[in-house]
């Protein structure tokens, strides 16, 4: 099942349903405006906020999922026939270095996650 909106979805092709979490509340995404996303990635824990709402909080099993201590960060959009005319732009990207165990800087109250079992 596709998410209501792809903004903030955790896309993971190895997951049986393709998405670890999905944004199921369309009102969180601002259409044709700037949206603010925040990612917390510390060790094997990943949290994502969209416009102040926690969309997902997942701790990946390090026995199954490779955790890199260094490398590149990718920001992407997937195109396709269903997304003709879609435009994506990014501004004010800040990357902050944190230490293992540092807590997230925002409250974690998941409002949109649909639980999806990881492989």
Predicted features along the sequence, with ranges:
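Carbohydrate-interacting regions of secretory-pathway proteins
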Residues: 1-119
């Amino acid at each position: 099942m596709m998410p209501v909106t792809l903004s903030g979805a955790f896309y993971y092709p190895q997951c049986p349903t393709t998405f670890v979490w999905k944004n199921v509340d369309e009102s969180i995404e601002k259409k044709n405006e700037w949206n603010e996303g925040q990612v917390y990635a510390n060790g094997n824990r990943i949290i994502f906020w969209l416009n102040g709402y926690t969309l997902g909080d997942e701790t990946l099993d390090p026995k199954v999922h490779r955790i890199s201590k260094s490398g590149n960060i990718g920001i992407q959009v997937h195109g396709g026939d269903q997304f003709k005319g879609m435009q994506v732009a990014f501004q004010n990207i800040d990357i902050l270095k944190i230490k293992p165990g540092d807590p997230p800087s925002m409250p974690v109250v998941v409002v949109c996650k649909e639980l999806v079992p990881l492989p």
